[in-house]
Amino acid sequence: MIRKFEKNENGDRRDYVMADVAIEADFCLKVSGDSMKGARILDGDMVFIRKQDRVENGSIAAVVVNNDSEATLRRIHYNSEKRVLILKPENPAYEDLIFSGDELNQIHILGKAVAFQSNIK
């Protein structure tokens, strides 16, 4: 999960992160958990997101399910013929989230993950 609306010490909903100027992203989110560790995205990492409501199959995206207050980071797989969307973690300890038919209305893609920044020192 990603804490989408975490407030900083001033009570603001935004903060600043030092990042490479070559990263073309609209916002970043801090990762909480290990569901994407197979993609080397670890707890505490910053994920840079480019806003877009659709992403290519196999892309990693930040997704909100059921208007939750947190976003989840998953690999997106969509079968347009069957109208099935699979949100796939990169950790076998977690299950796929599968949506079809009217359930697809529960999904809001915030954007595509375009870069990751680890806090490993």
Give the predicted meaning of each segment:
Residues 1-42, 54-57, 67-71, 75-84, ...:
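Short, positionally conserved secondary-structure boundary motifs
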Residues 46, 73-75, 98:
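Well-ordered beta-strand positions in beta-sheet-rich domains
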Residues 47-49, 62:
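Hydrophobic beta-strand signal
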Residues 51-52, 90:
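Fold-independent oxyanion-binding glycine-rich loops
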Residues 61-62, 97:
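Short, charged beta-strand/loop "edge" motif centered at a coil->beta-strand transition
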Residues 64-66, 88:
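A generic structural motif
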Residues 89-98:
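Flexible, small-/acidic-enriched active-site or ligand-binding loops
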